[in-house]
Amino acid sequence: MGMRMMFTVFLLVVLAATIVSFTSDRASDGRNVAAKAFHRIGRTIRDECCSNPACRVNNPHVCRRR
């Protein structure tokens, strides 16, 4: 292979690695956002239940202090 061909192959490999890295970072960001939203929803439901006496009596495992 000539020098130009080797340089072209090198650039293609770098480009492919960059694209794979970028898309995997974006996917992990999406999972983190989903986990944070799930945690926030759970905390909101727990807080609303624990502030309601009837719900607190029926669900003591939810309102247990940690």
Swiss-Prot record:
Region of interest (N-terminal tail important for activity on alpha-3-beta-2/CHRNA3-CHRNB2 and alpha-4-beta-2/CHRNA4-CHRNB2 nAChR), ranges: 45-48
Effect of residue 58 to A: 10.1-fold decrease in inhibitory potency on alpha-7/CHRNA7 nAChR, 2.6-fold increase in inhibitory potency on alpha-3-beta-2/CHRNA3-CHRNB2 nAChR, and complete loss of activity on alpha-4-beta-2/CHRNA4-CHRNB2 nAChR
Site entry: Key residue for activity on alpha-7/CHRNA7 and alpha-4-beta-2/CHRNA4-CHRNB2 nAChR: 56, 58
Swiss-Prot/TrEMBL keywords: Acetylcholine receptor inhibiting toxin, Disulfide bond, Gamma-carboxyglutamic acid, Hydroxylation, Ion channel impairing toxin, Neurotoxin, Postsynaptic neurotoxin, Secreted, Signal, Toxin
Signal among keywords: yes
GO CC annotation: extracellular region; host cell postsynaptic membrane
Residue numbers bearing the 4-hydroxyproline modification: 60
Result of altering residue 45 to A: No change in inhibitory potency on alpha-7/CHRNA7, 4.6-fold decrease or small increase in inhibitory potency on alpha-3-beta-2/CHRNA3-CHRNB2 (depending on experiments), 2-fold decrease or no change in inhibitory potency on alpha-4-beta-2/CHRNA4-CHRNB2 nAChR (depending on experiments)
Residue list for modification 4-carboxyglutamate: 48
Site for Important for determining subtype selectivity, residues: 54, 57
Cystine pairs: 49-55, 50-63
Annotated effect of mutating residue 46 to A: 2.5-fold decrease in inhibitory potency on alpha-7/CHRNA7, very important decrease in inhibitory potency on alpha-3-beta-2/CHRNA3-CHRNB2 nAChR, and loss of activity on alpha-4-beta-2/CHRNA4-CHRNB2 nAChR
Effect of residue 54 to V: >10-fold increase in selectivity on alpha-4-beta-2/CHRNA4-CHRNB2 over alpha-7/CHRNA7
Post-translational modification comment from the UniProt entry: Gamma-carboxyglutamation of Glu-48 seems to be not important for nAChR inhibition, since synthetic peptides without this modification do not show change in inhibition of alpha-7/CHRNA7 and alpha-3-beta-2/CHRNA3-CHRNB2 nAChR and show a 2.3-fold increase in inhibition of alpha-4-beta-2/CHRNA4-CHRNB2 nAChR. Hydroxylation of Pro-60 seems to be important for nAChR inhibition, since synthetic peptides without this modification show a small decrease in inhibition of alpha-7/CHRNA7 and alpha-3-beta-2/CHRNA3-CHRNB2 nAChR and a very important decrease in inhibition of alpha-4-beta-2/CHRNA4-CHRNB2 nAChR.
Signal peptide: 1-21
Stated role: Alpha-conotoxins act on postsynaptic membranes, they bind to the nicotinic acetylcholine receptors (nAChR) and thus inhibit them. This toxin reversibly blocks alpha-3-beta-2/CHRNA3-CHRNB2 (IC(50)=3.1-5.1 nM), alpha-7/CHRNA7 (IC(50)=4.5-5.1 nM), and alpha-4-beta-2/CHRNA4-CHRNB2 (IC(50)=128.6-390 nM) nAChRs.
Protein's name according to its UniProt entry: Alpha-conotoxin GID
